[in-house]
């Protein structure tokens, strides 16, 4: 009997600074290496999704954001694990971006998302982003 695949709950921020959103690039090595993503990470047990997204973004990028609302939730199954991703609209508040985990970042307008290579699970979030079309 196969072991059940681990399941992760992840919170990501769609971080707005006026009409631009922030995307970050994953390290080349490791899972989904070199792909772009929305910043965020795993939600801890008993942590609410807004606190998780603020904490993860602060840890990864050293910036402060204000979470506004949950805009989308998506389940995705990879070969060795599954994820539930909750996308939170956030507003950039303060701080200078430091790449503590990612290798690059860009502020882009939503239609430019299609110009970057994202993991399949993240692409499922695109349609819920304001101004994508």
Predicted regions and their residues:
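Conserved N-terminal beta-strand and adjoining loop/helix that marks the start
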Residues: 1-22
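NUDIX/MutT-family hydrolases
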Residues: 89-129
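C-terminal lobe/hinge of AMP-binding adenylation domains
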Residues: 25-27
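Short aromatic/basic micro-patch
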Residues: 37, 82, 106-107
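The catalytic Nudix box helix
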Residues: 38-72
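A conserved beta-turn-beta hairpin within the catalytic core of GNAT-like acetyltransferases
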Residues: 30-35
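Acidic pyrophosphate-coordinating catalytic loop
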Residues: 3-4, 29, 73-85
């Amino acid at each position: 009997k196969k072991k059940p695949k681990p399941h992760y709950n992840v919170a990501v921020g769609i971080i707005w600074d006026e009409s631009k959103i922030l995307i970050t690039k994953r390290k080349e090595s490791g899972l989904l290496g070199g792909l772009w993503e929305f910043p965020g990470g795993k939600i801890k047990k008993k942590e609410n999704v807004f606190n998780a997204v603020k904490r993860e973004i602060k840890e990864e990028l050293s910036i402060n954001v204000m979470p506004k609302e949950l805009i989308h939730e998506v389940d995705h199954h990879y070969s060795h694990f599954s994820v539930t991703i909750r996308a939170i609209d956030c507003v950039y508040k303060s701080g200078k971006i430091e790449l503590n985990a990612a290798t690059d970042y860009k502020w882009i307008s939503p239609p430019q998302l299609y110009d970057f290579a994202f993991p399949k699970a993240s692409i499922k979030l695109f349609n819920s982003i304001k101004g994508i079309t």
